[in-house]
Every structure is written in structure tokens, then in C-alpha cells.
Regions:
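Acidic, metal-binding active-site segment of PIN/NYN-like and related structure-specific nucleases
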Residues: 49-67
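Intrinsically disordered, low-complexity and often Lys/Arg-enriched segments
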Residues: 1-6, 123-124
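A general structural motif
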Residues: 3-5, 53, 72, 107
């Protein structure tokens, strides 16, 4: 289901194609790889995403387990083998983004992998 515009914070391991896709839909996107945030520690990025009320998108499973509160609005973890190309990751994200009940993302960690996704409440 599609609805509303969101604010995203894309970790540096997320392909530019996904940033372009979200921006073209009108979403507000901070792309770590494209600016001065590149190379900053995960905890700094996490806090920044949380402070700005953004959805944190990453491929780094370790970044999703930070015991820092408050958490970002939601966390989207892109899973799959390291051999997945930017094209494959973009297609995987697009399939998820076109199916998900977007208004239910807040407060969830979403694990997106080839063939589907799972949502889990963020533990506080």
C-alpha cells in the first residue's frame, strides 16, 4: 500500500539507485555516501536518524542492534548475499516498498530479503 511521504537516512552501504528511487517519489532522503557523513560511526548516524525522525536504511546488521535510545522512526535492513548487485538490491527494495503497509513502519525493524520481508517491533 502506498501512502504519505517519509524521511529517510540511507547508510553508506545502500546503493544510490535506492536514494534516487525514493527522491523521485518525493521522499526526503539523506544519503550518507554522498556527503560529509561518510565514514561517521554507526552510533552517530543512528542518533542523527532518530533526532530527525527518519527511517534508517542499511545493509549492516550490526548497525540495527545498537542499544541506543531513542531509535530511528523505523529501520529497514537489506539482507542477502554480498554478491547482490545494486540493481538486485534496488529491485528487492522496490518490491518491498510497493507491498508494505507504509503507515505501519514506525517502531519496526524490517528485514528485507530476496522474496519477501519480515517486520519486528523495535525493542525499547
Amino acid at each position: 500500500m502506498r501512502s504519505g511521504l517519509f524521511r529517510f537516512f540511507l547508510d553508506e552501504n545502500v546503493p544510490r539507485r535506492i536514494a534516487d528511487r525514493l527522491s523521485s517519489e518525493g521522499h526526503d532522503v539523506v544519503e550518507v555516501a554522498a556527503g560529509p557523513l561518510r565514514g561517521k560511526p554507526d552510533d552517530y548516524l543512528w542518533r542523527r536518524a532518530a533526532a530527525e525522525g527518519r527511517i534508517f536504511v542499511t545493509r549492516d546488521i550490526g548497525a540495527t542492534a545498537l542499544p541506543i535510545r531513542p531509535a530511528p522512526l523505523a529501520i529497514i535492513l537489506l539482507r542477502g548475499p554480498e554478491t547482490l548487485t545494486a540493481v538486485h538490491l534496488d529491485a528487492m527494495f522496490a518490491a518491498f516498498w510497493n507491498l508494505v503497509e507504509r503507515e505501519q513502519l514506525a517502531g519496526h525493524l524490517v528485514s528485507v530479503r530476496p522474496g519477501g520481508y519480515r517486520m519486528h517491533r523495535i525493542r525499547i
